[in-house]
From Swiss-Prot:
Domain of life: Eukaryota
UniProt-listed Gene3D superfamilies: Immunoglobulins
Signal peptide: none
Organism: Caenorhabditis elegans
Gene assigned in the entry: ssp-19
Protein name: Sperm-specific class P protein 19
Any one GO molecular function term: protein homodimerization activity
PROSITE patterns per UniProt: MSP
InterPro entries, A to Z: Ig-like_fold, MSP_dom, PapD-like_sf, Sperm-specific_class_P
Length: 109
């Protein structure tokens, strides 16, 4: 089971903008994920919970609101999804995370 982010980092202007990234499942199992941010005041993430099909990808939109330039990060926690799962948030609570992917975020002036 493997999950990667493309692009692997996010650099945005501190004045605010959105950036789209793909979570790519390189394995043969469906993955459930949850995204945590080190800065919930200036970043919005959609979706926070989700599934990535085997050999598939899922778009994640990172939106930066206006604020002071600084370094932050997103951490994507992931695990194999239960076979019958349809609700990502409920499924994620029911499994133990198997790995993480860190996406460094940089807001520049």
């Amino acid at each position: 089971m493997s999950l990667t982010a493309d692009p692997p980092a996010c650099t945005v202007p501190a004045a605010g903008v959105s950036s789209t990234h793909k979570l790519v499942n390189g394995g043969a199992e469906k993955i459930v994920f949850k995204i945590k941010s080190s800065n919930n005041n200036e970043y919005r993430i959609a979706p926070v919970f989700g599934f990535v099909d085997p050999s598939g990808s899922k778009d994640v939109v990172i939106t930066r609101t206006a604020g002071a330039p600084k370094e932050d990060k997103l951490v994507v926690h992931f695990a194999s999804a239960p076979a019958d799962a349809t609700d990502a948030q409920a499924a994620f609570v029911a499994v133990a995370p198997a790995g993480t992917v860190t996406i460094p975020m940089s807001a520049t002036a």
